[in-house]
């Protein structure tokens, strides 16, 4: 062991005789104490060692970070990944060195502890100037312990920075590898796409060459065929115009003859039907009067020579596609008068009369025709969002109702009956709503309309004209159909 404060050879001999040797398991980094200076407040300041030029861990970390930020924009993705791998290895090495420094620091604390214990033992055995020297050595050992603690704090901070940098470099390395793999996959996809495009273009070029070659081979034949067709057309223009024109005139004459015969056939069929009906009516004591179109009334009356009271007969009306087809009963139509509605257009109207146990049937001469001007009237109303009609309430819930004029509004989503600001009834289109021409007793059946909002609430409305009534029915059914509702009469 080195001497603490030697003066003479005799004192050195006495010290060697008195001081006990230090344990042999303590190892020293050098054979002398490091040099220190006392700064303000008795703080120990290290004197720089000229031989020690190794940079600290903090300086190395700062330098590597600066180099990384400077070269980040200059490096490619692959070079950046390699650089991150190298820095990650360096950071791992620094972490290992920090672990070794922890072991060395622990050995330093053990060494200082044993040295201080030895000096304490020496101080108890010495006196005078030797005691002062030992106390000074103890204070130096304590200062060394404080300095070692400070160095350990700095080392812990550097270790934390190194770990932080290592995690950052590891993450950056993973991101760089991921980016490299992504760019590689993109490049492979582009290469495959370019390869497929090249193959497609090559196939198109080959096909074009084959087509051009085939066209060159077939060129003379095509030209020959074109010449033959042109020659044939020229010959046709020169020699056949009279025959073609004659055939066209013959076709026109044949068409006109067919149309005349068809019209004559229809006329004969109507005459035959009228004759048959007249023959059948000789045995039937009832006659059906009225025009067979919308806006009119079909009225059953007894023949002049029968003398039967029609009011005492049981009557029911039917509609059918033709006289021989299956009939459909018109619910509620049991009077001697019936006004056809738009639902009856194109159909034959029949009526069964039961009198004195005998059943008779009267039929219209043909299907019911639409009224003139009704289609254009409906088309003009469809351009509006709401259409208003002036009506009078004749009945409400089957009871006669004395009423003033009201406004019957047919909209795209609902029907409303109002007078001024007061709304009498309003309802949206639904399956419970019914709307049709009147079928029961009414003063003017051709102008009357039956409207059921819902069960328990019905109206019998009279319009200003037959056309307004039929237009309102067609318009309401069109809007209801757009709402997926079929708006018809009872049991239709």
UniProtKB/Swiss-Prot annotation:
GO biological process, one term: regulation of stomatal movement
Membrane-crossing residue ranges in chain numbering: none
One GO MF term attached to the UniProt entry: actin binding
Cross-referenced Pfam families: SCAB-ABD, SCAB-Ig, SCAB-PH, SCAB_CC
Coiled-coil ranges (or none): 112-132
Disulfide bonds: none
One term under GO cellular component: cytoskeleton
Main localization category: cytoplasm
Superkingdom: Eukaryota
Location in the cell: Cytoplasm, Cytoskeleton
Tissues expressing the protein: Expressed in roots, stems, leaves, siliques and flowers.
Keywords: Actin-binding, Coiled coil, Cytoplasm, Cytoskeleton
CDD domains xref list: SCAB1_middle (cd11675)
Chain's role: Probable plant-specific actin binding protein that bundles and stabilizes microfilaments (MFs).
Protein family according to the UniProt entry: Belongs to the SCAB family.
Listed name of the protein: Stomatal closure-related actin-binding protein 2
């Amino acid at each position: 062991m080195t001497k603490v404060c030697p003066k003479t050879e005799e004192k050195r001999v006495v010290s060697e005789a008195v001081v006990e040797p230090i344990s042999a398991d303590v190892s020293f980094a050098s054979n002398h104490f490091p040099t220190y200076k006392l700064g303000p407040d008795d703080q120990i300041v290290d004197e720089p060692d000229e031989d020690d030029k190794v940079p600290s861990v903090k300086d190395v970390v700062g330098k590597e970070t600066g180099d990384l930020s400077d070269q980040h924009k200059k490096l490619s993705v692959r070079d950046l990944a390699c650089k991150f791998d190298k820095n990650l290895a360096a950071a791992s090495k620094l972490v290992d060195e920090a672990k070794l420094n922890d072991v060395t620091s622990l050995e330093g604390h053990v060494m200082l502890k044993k040295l201080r214990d030895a000096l304490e033992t020496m101080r108890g055995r010495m006196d005078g100037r030797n005691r002062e020297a030992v106390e000074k050595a103890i204070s130096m050992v304590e200062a060394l312990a404080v300095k070692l603690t400070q160095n350990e704090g700095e080392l812990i901070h550097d270790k934390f920075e190194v770990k932080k940098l290592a995690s950052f470099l590891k993450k950056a390395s993973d991101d760089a590898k991921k980016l490299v793999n992504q760019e590689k996959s993109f490049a492979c996809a582009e290469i495959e796409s370019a390869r497929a495009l090249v193959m497609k273009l090559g196939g198109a070029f080959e096909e074009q060459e084959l087509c051009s070659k085939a066209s060159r081979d077939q060129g003379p034949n095509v030209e020959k065929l074109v010449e033959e067709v042109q020659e044939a057309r020229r010959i046709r223009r020169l020699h056949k115009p009279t025959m073609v024109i004659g055939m066209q005139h013959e076709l026109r004459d044949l068409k006109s003859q067919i149309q005349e015969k068809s019209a004559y056939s229809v006329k004969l069929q109507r005459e035959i039907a009228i004759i048959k009906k007249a023959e059948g009516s000789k045995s039937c004591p009832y006659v059906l009067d009225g025009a067979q179109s919308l806006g009119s009334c079909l009225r059953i009356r007894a023949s002049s020579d029968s003398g039967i009271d029609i009011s005492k007969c049981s009557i029911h009306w039917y509609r059918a596609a033709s006289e021989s087809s299956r009939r459909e009963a018109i619910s509620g139509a049991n009077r001697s008068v019936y006004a056809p509605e738009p639902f009856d257009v194109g159909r034959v109207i029949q009526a069964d009369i039961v009198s004195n146990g005998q059943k008779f049937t009267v039929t219209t001469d043909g299907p019911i025709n639409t009224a003139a001007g009704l289609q254009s009237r409906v088309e003009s109303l469809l351009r509006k969002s709401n259409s208003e009609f002036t009506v009078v309430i004749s009945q409400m819930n089957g009871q006669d109702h004395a009423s003033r004029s009201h406004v019957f509004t047919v909209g795209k989503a609902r029907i409303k009956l109002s007078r001024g600001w007061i709304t009498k009834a309003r309802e949206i289109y639904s399956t419970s709503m019914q709307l049709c021409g009147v079928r029961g007793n009414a003063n003017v059946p051709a102008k009357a309309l039956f409207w059921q909002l819902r069960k328990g609430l019905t109206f019998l409305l009279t319009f200003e004209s037959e056309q307004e009534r039929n237009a309102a029915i067609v318009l309401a059914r069109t809007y209801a159909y757009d709402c997926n509702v079929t708006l018809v009469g009872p049991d239709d």
